[in-house]
């Protein structure tokens, strides 16, 4: 089990790399994360929902993701509450206190999923969450040492040296564990190192002497891995000298599945800009409203930032707009939440840019989807997925045709505004080319996104093979 001294220490990446190392050896391996808190999620083949990081790790294993790889997924929908996904299905909304009490019940489900994976696979690589040394979260813990003790698994602890204080992080984390938990820790990994390793050796010697635990590896800082993030937005880009398309995405307070835009960010011909609080939406060919876990609240936030007026001005100047999932719902005339699915029951007036009305319902649509997009008399095949509550009634043209034959999405009479429920909408090369032509007449050739992810996974595995003591780790 890989645990970390902090969030974003490199747990997800290390597990993905170790999974690929084992898969290369012909070992049947699967990833597992008992509890994940993230708004970036993926749909499994059997119609369940898990954290996106576990889907990437499953890809590293060369296996299909299943709900048992992430049995508890927490999707925050307010500062104090979240939707709880249990073995792929929405259980209920809980506040922090309610979930803290529920964890003692959830442990049984977590162990059930883990048992199913251990029965099917030769090896299971487990990822913890946050830090095992969060004193206030130790009771009923299912994410870190609480699970490790119940499942009786060995642990390695990873820390990020790039943020500073790596020896304090590792030494302090170990010191805050119980004696039995300390005995379970087999070693440390230092992540994101850059520089001369010789300058680090005295510190490594000190750490090993003080803790009695070996440093199993020092991993280099790997830029541009192109893997879908668990939650944090990545804005890093390498642009060509002649950008063909300027895209702006407003960052909503509960933005979800912003991995939709990775394929745009990684294209050197596209300047993707995330607009945050206090910033204006301007200088764009295309504005994309992203998905959100709290549509009505984020619609209020969008208006509080003046972005509704920015979008109207953008359209008057001939710009294009696309809404994805929750962003699609916002573009309509009305969002009705009669049962309080996302908070207090009530209705919100939409932006009125598409002739649709949406009713939020208790049931969640979870499916992997194939469709055909038709724009300006041309077509392209879309491969995406749906994760949403609610149904939208559409009046007027619909630009997508699902493989089932059902129409999907909506497009305005003026032809400048479009919406769809499909996440992953831009991933296919033909779709991006067709959309860019619709936006400003340019032809953009998309890189193979799956190939980029594979390259990133292999780079991690290569670094692990070179810089970690795998003989000790896997003995």
Swiss-Prot record:
InterPro entries listed in its UniProt record: Class_I_gatase-like (IPR029062), CobQ/CobB/MinD/ParA_Nub-bd_dom (IPR002586), CobQ_GATase1 (IPR033949), CobQ_N (IPR047045), CobQ_synth (IPR004459), GATase_3 (IPR011698), P-loop_NTPase (IPR027417)
GO biological process: cobalamin biosynthetic process
Residues forming the catalytic site: 325, 423
Residue intervals of the GATase cobBQ-type domain: 244-431
Keyword Lipid biosynthesis attached: no
GO molecular function: ABC-type vitamin B12 transporter activity; catalytic activity
Sorted UniProt keywords: Cobalamin biosynthesis, Glutamine amidotransferase
CDD domains noted in UniProt: CobQ_N, GATase1_CobQ
Pathway the protein contributes to: Cofactor biosynthesis; adenosylcobalamin biosynthesis
Protein family per UniProt: Belongs to the CobB/CobQ family. CobQ subfamily.
Physiological role: Catalyzes amidations at positions B, D, E, and G on adenosylcobyrinic A,C-diamide. NH(2) groups are provided by glutamine, and one molecule of ATP is hydrogenolyzed for each amidation.
Protein name: Cobyric acid synthase
Gene designation: cobQ
